[in-house]
Regions:
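Beta-lactamase-like hydrolase cores
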Residues: 2-55, 70-72, 129
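Penicillin-recognizing serine hydrolase domain
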Residues: 21-27, 98, 124-214
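Short active-site loop at a secondary-structure junction
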Residues: 42-63, 73-75, 96-104
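Short, well-structured active-site flanking segments
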Residues: 66-79, 175-183
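Conserved catalytic neighborhood of penicillin-recognizing serine enzymes
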Residues: 84-116, 197-212
């Protein structure tokens, strides 16, 4: 199970020296790559196919940002408002901008935000999953398959640490993505949101130099 993706504004060799492969990582699956060159700096079961849980939302966010029109409003459906797991708490028939939904998605890991984006962009969860799989093919992600925008348990929904690292590196090319995943709090007034948001990603609060991601 992949549970986190970390981005750092540091040279990892400056911290651990040349003997980076001796680094101890408790996670079963881990990989470190250079964002620009994609050079693999450390790898531990990085190509194993495993469920990726809410790190799925990295791709949901990336597709949404590349689509553009972040000020468009989507209507929250009953399907979205009643989803299990982590949510923002959006109510059925609420109208939320795409930008705010992105913050709900990545700040709060909101499954309700994920479904609202998926339905607004793809027409349905199934339609959005098709977009996700077409997109991952265009990025050359060979070890991934997507069935949902949020990562709740599905039978054929998986990725690898390596694929998620490549996906994250792509996301970090976009200013909007970097802003969303790299900040701790945002007030309702900044973009005329419906509520304030605080980022639940503990990495941002506990690790100096961290700038995301999930």
């Amino acid at each position: 199970l992949i549970i986190g993706v970390l981005a750092l504004n540091i040279n990892i060799k400056d911290v651990y020296g040349e003997n980076i492969q001796s680094l101890r990582v408790d996670a079963r699956n881990a990989i470190a790559i250079d964002r620009e060159s994609k050079t693999i700096l450390f790898e531990q079961n990085g190509y194993e196919l495993v469920p990726m849980a809410s790190t799925t939302k990295i791709l949901t966010a990336l597709i949404t940002i590349e689509r553009g029109n972040l000020d468009e409003k989507f209507v929250v459906s009953k399907n979205a408002s009643s989803v299990r797991g982590s949510t923002v708490g959006y109510k059925e028939n609420e109208e939320i901008t795409v930008r705010e939904l992105l913050y709900g998605l990545m700040y709060r890991s909101g499954n309700d935000a994920a479904i609202t984006l998926a339905e607004g962009i793809g027409g349905s969860i199934e339609g959005f999953a098709e977009i996700m799989n077409n997109y991952k093919t265009s990025l050359g992600l060979l070890d991934s398959h997507f069935e949902s925008p949020h990562g709740l348990d599905m039978t054929d929904h998986y990725s690898s640490a390596y694929d998620l690292a490549l996906l994250t590196a792509k996301g970090m090319e976009y200013e909007e993505f970097r802003e969303i995943v790299g900040t701790k709090e945002i007030s309702q007034s900044k973009y005329n949101f419906t509520r304030d948001y605080s980022n639940i990603n503990k990495i941002l609060w506990k690790i100096p130099g961290a700038n995301g991601v999930k």
